[in-house]
Amino acid sequence: MAGHSKWANIQHRKGRQDAARSKLFSKFSKEITVAAKMGDPDPDKNPRLRLAIKEAKSQSMPKDNIERAIKKAIGGDGDAYEEIRYEGYGPNGVAVIVEAMTDNRNRTASNVRSTFTKHGGNLGETGSVGFMFERKGEVVYPASVGDADTVMMAAIEAGAEDVESSEEGHVIWCADTDLNEVSTALEAELGESDSTKLVWKPSTTTELDLEAMQKLMKLVDALEDDDDVQRVTTNFEASDEVMAAL
């Protein structure tokens, strides 16, 4: 499990530091609109929409923005978007998965490819790095909900697969298809989570020093700046010292 909690932490650190809140909210809005369009606009009847709203709320997205995004779907918007996954290697051979939602496949592919090239990476075919990750559900709780044993018992009862507990909190993993049921059971036992979402969890990692991490983060930042890109995941491993120096 080494590195996975650090990997999760950098995702959260990035989210908190994202100065362009409007860009972040725009990505959440798109996900909410598409989720509502693909299923029921009632989150109680649409697990994907429920998770999208929960993640948006965890980043303090205003309720009005969320409601507007759902109304867009009811009004017919969201039809044009398709979900695409790009895979490739960043600098120093780090595996990178880019999840996009776009109304222009050619534009997005061109932008993602040029961003990889510009930052010392290489965009590959779909499946070129996917084998290094597993699709999992991830539920994050603050340390304040209880000690490791308490959370482990709740996780086992809820049907989760694994738990990582540290001073910073608890990360609970489950099968991707079980996320809605597991997160609902956890909430009944532990209260509302900090975060509940589907993720690509690295099964193998690449160790990076500070210089390599800085290069990688330039690529990740550039990819995340693209309006079509929803999410970027990598399989880096780094020491606490490197993470602290970023």
Swiss-Prot record:
GO terms for molecular function: DNA binding. It is found in: Cytoplasm. Keywords: Cytoplasm, DNA-binding, Transcription, Transcription regulation. Gene3D superfamilies: 1.10.10.200, 3.30.70.980. Its main location: cytoplasm. The keyword Transcription regulation applies. Residues 1-22 are annotated as: Disordered. It holds the Pfam family TACO1_YebC_N. GO terms for biological process: regulation of DNA-templated transcription. GO terms for cellular component: cytosol. InterPro entries: Integrase-like_N (IPR017856), TACO1_YebC-like_2nd/3rd_dom (IPR048300), TACO1_YebC_N (IPR049083), Transcrip_reg_TACO1-like (IPR002876), Transcrip_reg_TACO1-like_dom3 (IPR026564), YebC-like (IPR029072). Belongs to the TACO1 family. This is Probable transcriptional regulatory protein SPO1072. It comes from Ruegeria pomeroyi (strain ATCC 700808 / DSM 15171 / DSS-3) (Silicibacter pomeroyi).
